Amino acid sequence: ACAVMGLGGQAVAQAVSDEDELALAYGDKSFVSIATGSRVPVSRAPAVATVITAQDIASMGATDLDEVLETVPGLHVARETQGFAPVYVIRGINLGFNPQVLMLINGIPMTTVYTGNRGGGWGGMPVENIARVEVIRGPGSALYGADAFSGVINVITKTSSDIQGTEVGLRGGSFKTGDAWILHGGKWGAVDVSGYLRIGQTDGDRRTVQADAQTGSDAQRGTLASRAPGPINNGRDSTDGALDLSLDNWRFRVAYKERDDIGTGTGVASALDPGGEIYSQTITSDLTYENRNIAEDWAANMQVSVMHYTELTDLTLFPAGTRAFYPSEVYADGIIGNPAKWERHGRVGGSATYTGFKLHRIRLGLGAEREEVYKTRETKNFRADFSRIGTGSRADIIDVSDTAPFMRPQGRTKRYLYAQDEWNLVKDWTLTAGLRNDHYSDFGSTTNPRLALVWEAAYNVTTKLLYGTAFRAPSMSELYAINNPVITGNPNLRPEKIQTLEAAVSWQPLPKLQLGMNFFHYEMKDIIRLISSVYQNNGQQKGNGLEFEATWDPMKDVRLTGNYSYQRSVDEATGQAAANAPRHHVYLRTNWRFTPGWSVDPQVNWVSKRPREQGDPRSDLKGYATVDLTLRTDRASRGWDVAMSVRNLFDVDAREPTPYDVGQPFISLPYDFPLPGRSVYVQASYQF
């Protein structure tokens, strides 16, 4: 008996040791907070959720958040026409400027109210200060309100306990890329302190665009103004900083993000603009009080946050010599427009959780927000009908901010309240029910419910049945844009709406093998689209699909991860497949720690063909498969972490789709967006 007990104890100790070692290598992915507002096991969360840790990010060689998100099942990172900004396509929903995805940093929305997305000056997000990324696919408005439509992304930054000391790092590589950063985590008396500063610069990939909108105009007008064939303008200068202070139940955070000389990609009007640039500045701060035992059976959380966003531009919409709009008018220096906008956001909210009722966990919350574009400015050398001022030179640029603004300053207030109950119906069964009401001062109220039934069918099997609705608030430009012949706002817009039904199962058939699969069906209505140059609620879209993911540790030093996604979305008006989203998506990665302190990570990303919009004469855009490779040494005992990554190892000609302009006699970018070719990066960091 003693021998049996000894062997059993040894086996348990070995299992615990293996689990601890895996957690150290890959990070703790067993819990998620984004699904309910409190920390719960991922397998029992009332949502389809993915957690990516800092260890995952380092192993895959990612340098920007977009590279991290591309690995999430059901999520593909496409590109938009203006500034090559990322478009997070979740479950086939790829509309407008991508306002259907809510981006949070430490729970604070990064939404800019003018466009409803992350802003034209987003300029990427570096990963050095990211502790983990939590993603839910599906509606989240019952907890998070507006824009938690197709999904929610929450980026959680590092605290003093994550850093524990000082780290300095350097990176260099292709496209004249250079980055330097410093992280520090420690104590200042009784206060936990963490700080982060990063400076970066890149010229970006400069793959050639063979033809652009000016090429089509040249063919129509008999001019030779186009700069195509020519390179994409994808450079930027970056500055990021953050400070995190916590004491007992209080936490104060402030973050600064500046992007300068952001390239305009293929041009904001789909005409190459090699000298065009965008500047943005984002300043956020928040003060949070959290007490998990404020009274018997009660926990409370209160938060005040502010965000200030500035976006300035210097743009040549069409190049010198163009006759893009009037055959008799040649623009000496091109069609120049420089819109600028300033936003501020203020939020206050709180929640309370009560556990005094047996088998129930009740969460109540309320809050208010003020969001406004408080200042706009524009200088340009053309009138509202696109006729030129003077000869169309830079000397003819005038300030039209007071006489013909693209939008006058606007603001709105919203109030919200919500309730959620996590009810343990019987052993192994949990029902989560929630309801949230949001009232906006401009378009009124909307109420969104959620229901989630989770059954732990066996010690290694969990099933979920989920239902929820969500809404996407109209942006300020969609409501109030003026003095633009191709875009006019509509103050009578209603929010976009979606309802989603999901079924999910997670299964761990072996101690080192985890499998997950989910099926979904969604229905969208009141889609906001441009109809005859005016924004209107027009259109419906339905979709269904599945997502499969697996993690397998065949040996102690090897981990295989992968996922497959399928979606079929249909535009109800046309009966055709919804445009510009891949039907199939596969991601595979191997992490092999082949000797102590060293690892190699190859990964493959396959994106299937993407259907075109109705009326687009081009064939569907072909798919692509890229391979990345990262070699990394983490000599923790000596403080060094060195990595080399090769992205797009085989230099595949990968492309993302460009839009089709209905009624235009030519396609602005007929050969789509070329993605970066092969690139190599080397980085080294030292911790002490």
What role is predicted for each listed range?
Residues 109-137:
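Short acidic/polar hinge/loop motifs at secondary-structure boundaries
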